[in-house]
């Protein structure tokens, strides 16, 4: 059975996860960041969540990954394309 301290620690870690997810979803929705930047943000959040809950990868993939994917698809700007210059016509 978990001790009172262990339960308090888990609750504190869960609050941190909620805060990270809320903040990053707001940034994706409101900042106009590029897809690349949004994906980088999500990767950093994922790493932080898994540091807080090392056995939580499956939960992350079930709960948060689809949510972040949808937000990125809906709100992130496409990355700038690369413009290739071709030589002009030969004369």
PLM features per residue range, with description:
Residues 1-91:
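Surface-exposed peri-terminal alpha-helical interaction modules
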């Amino acid at each position: 059975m978990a001790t009172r301290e262990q339960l308090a620690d888990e609750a504190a870690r869960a609050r941190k996860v909620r805060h990270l997810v809320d903040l990053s979803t707001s940034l994706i929705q409101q900042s106009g960041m590029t897809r690349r930047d949004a994906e980088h943000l999500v990767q950093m959040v994922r790493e932080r969540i898994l540091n807080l809950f090392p056995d939580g990868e499956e939960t992350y993939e079930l709960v948060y990954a689809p949510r972040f994917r949808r937000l990125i698809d809906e709100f992130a700007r496409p990355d700038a394309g690369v413009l290739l210059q071709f030589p002009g016509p030969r004369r």
